[in-house]
A protein has these predicted regions:
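Conserved anion-binding
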Residues: 2-101
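Glycine-rich phosphate-binding active-site loops on the catalytic face of alpha/beta enzymes
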Residues: 23-27, 70-77, 108-132
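C-terminal helical cap(s) of enzyme catalytic domains, especially alpha/beta-barrels
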Residues: 32-34, 106, 117-155
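Ligand-binding grooves and catalytic loops that recognize ribose/phosphate and carbohydrate rings
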Residues: 56-64, 107-111, 133-139
Length: 155
């Protein structure tokens, strides 16, 4: 978090990471600098508390955006009603997601992708069984008629 762009560039170039996922106070100048240093995708996380936070996310020069609660590891979601009908750009959804609420998130607010962390951990470490259950939940929902009829294409 808040590492110098050159440090993130090094991690991308040596293959340690493949996407720069920014969760700090990185501003547009930082994102543009990092993008000038590498061809790897840059993802910026935004804490969503009100509609204006969505405007900031939509305006970001990051290749990808992640919409989050902002309080990591609490298991809390933000107010998803803020995203209902929001189609300004594809986004990853994070914050409080678990196998029980993933179907609701997909059906209700149509994220392009999901980001799971503490919900698939046991004692602070990734739990293979929890990960497999989450993947199974998404795949089961993806194969449903509702998902196929409502999948959005952005251009």
């Amino acid at each position: 978090v808040n590492a110098a762009p050159e440090r993130v560039e090094k991690l991308l170039l040596d293959g340690t990471i493949h996407i720069a996922q920014l969760h700090g106070q990185e501003d547009e100048a930082y994102i543009k600098k990092l993008k000038s240093l590498t061809d790897h995708p840059v993802m910026k996380a935004f804490s969503i508390q009100e509609k204006k936070d969505l405007d900031a996310a939509a305006a970001s020069s990051a290749d990808l955006i992640l919409l989050d609660h902002g309080k990591g590891g609490t298991g809390e979601t933000f107010d998803w009603s803020l995203l209902e009908g929001w189609t300004k750009r594809p986004y990853f959804l994070a914050g409080g997601l678990n196998p029980e609420n993933i179907p609701e998130a997909i059906q209700r607010i149509h994220p392009w992708g999901i980001d799971l962390s503490s919900a698939v951990e046991t004692d602070g470490k990734k739990d293979r069984e929890k990960i497999l259950q989450a993947v199974k939940t998404v795949r089961n929902f993806e194969s449903s008629k509702h998902f196929l009829e409502n999948k959005r294409v952005y251009g």
